């Protein structure tokens, strides 16, 4: 009887582990350009002005100079049918990041995100910020640790995964927020990133916020190392460049007992 109970418990544990592995592995099969949001995710940009106004706002950081409604424009998709979002807000002309960046009104801790972008011109520059803190660079022509696809200053640029100018690209990310105990940081934030279906960063620890106070939440705290236990939205950066976005969706997660790898 004891052996039967043990066998039953072991089988249940195995089944649970298999389900978790299958769930994560199934994510890897539903990534890249054109990936559709799962039922448990929320769409944050579907090409409409209505959704932009409903779910996004300007990030009002220390350098903020915009004025609502958001001045990012809705334009025709240059590749496929439909409309997309252009990050070229006139307020940010000349590379003035932080003046007209947009962020989701909803804030997050752990999440999975899908963002598609297209850079039409050489040197096109924007950025995707996890929890309005940690930037995944969007910058044509730069393959350094500050370049395209890099978790800025934390990893090398996976430039090899880039589809190139005038083509759609996709970031698929699972992010785990920093953990705190009694108000003290005990675990740094981590992320796994796929770039156009290729895994480029695996369960990568993120040490700090880079770029100073105009970059995002906590950017001005102890040189970006003073991370606080505050959730943040998904932010897109305006630097006065034509960078297009579409098909943005986010799935909230609870990764207390799991890595970000998938």
Question: What are the language-model segments listed below?
Answer:
Residues 6-7, 21, 82:
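Intrinsically disordered/low-complexity terminal segments and short unstructured peptides
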């Amino acid at each position: 009887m004891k052996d039967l109970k043990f066998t039953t418990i072991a089988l249940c544990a195995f089944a649970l582990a298999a389900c978790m592995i299958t769930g994560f592995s199934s994510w890897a099969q539903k990534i890249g350009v054109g990936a559709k949001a799962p039922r448990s995710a929320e769409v944050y940009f579907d090409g409409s002005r209505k959704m932009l106004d409903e779910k996004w706002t300007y990030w009002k950081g220390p350098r903020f100079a915009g004025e609502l409604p958001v001045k990012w424009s809705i334009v025709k998709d240059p590749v496929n049918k439909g409309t997309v979002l252009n990050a070229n807000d006139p307020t940010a002309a000349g590379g003035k990041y932080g003046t007209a960046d947009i962020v989701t009104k909803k804030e997050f801790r752990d999440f999975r995100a899908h963002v598609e972008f297209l850079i039409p011109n050489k040197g096109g520059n924007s950025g995707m910020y996890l929890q309005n803190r940690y930037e995944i660079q969007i910058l044509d022509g730069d393959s350094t640790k500050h370049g395209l696809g890099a978790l800025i200053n934390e990893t090398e640029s996976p430039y090899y995964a880039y589809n190139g100018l005038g083509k759609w690209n996709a970031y698929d990310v699972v992010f785990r927020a920093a953990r705190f105990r009694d108000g003290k940081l005990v675990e740094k934030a981590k992320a796994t990133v796929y770039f156009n279906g290729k895994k480029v960063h695996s369960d990568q620890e993120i040490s700090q916020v880079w770029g100073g106070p105009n970059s995002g939440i906590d950017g001005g705290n102890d040189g970006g190392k003073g991370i606080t236990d505050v959730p943040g939205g998904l932010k897109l950066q305006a630097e006065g460049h034509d960078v297009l976005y579409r098909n943005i969706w986010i799935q909230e997660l609870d990764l207390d007992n799991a890595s970000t790898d998938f």
